[in-house]
Regions:
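Short, thiol/selenol-centered motifs that function as redox-active sites or metal-ligating centers
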Residues: 69-77
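Hydrophobic/aromatic-rich core segments of domains that either
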Residues: 58, 77-125
Length: 125
């Protein structure tokens, strides 16, 4: 398969699942949205590391162009819905006590946040 075709297919997969992810993100709390999208993701292929990185780049490219700009929680939910490996990983939601713009972050996997910041509270799902 050509690289261009692979990118086009990945774009199509992300765009196809985006409405379902966005509906869950906007209407359900994480307690319900994450398990719902994990069930979907567990039925998807488990990507190798390089394919998973390509998926993240595709998700980020689409996410950045959506109304309101990029959203880390939406990116996490998209990855969980599209990859069996991501569906098995911990979803972390970090918040700062002071609140305000950019006072929270969502990421996948063990350990500290992927943005290098520290959060007062981290909820793990």
């Amino acid at each position: 398969m050509s690289a261009l075709l692979g990118v086009a297919l990945e774009l199509a997969r992300v765009v196809a699942v985006l409405p379902r992810v966005e509906l869950a993100r906007r209407t359900q709390g994480p307690k319900h949205a994450v398990p719902t999208l994990r069930r979907l993701g567990r039925r998807r292929p488990r990507r190798a590391d390089d394919a998973r990185a390509a998926l993240r780049r595709t998700i980020a490219a689409i996410d950045a162009r959506l109304p309101g700009g990029g959203n880390c929680y939406r990116r996490v939910l998209l990855e969980v819905a599209l990859d069996a490996g991501a569906a098995e990983e911990r979803v972390a939601l970090g918040v700062r006590a002071g609140g305000g713009v950019r006072s929270g972050h969502a990421w996948l996997g063990e350990g500290p946040s992927d943005d290098g910041e520290r959060y007062d509270l981290v909820i793990e799902l």
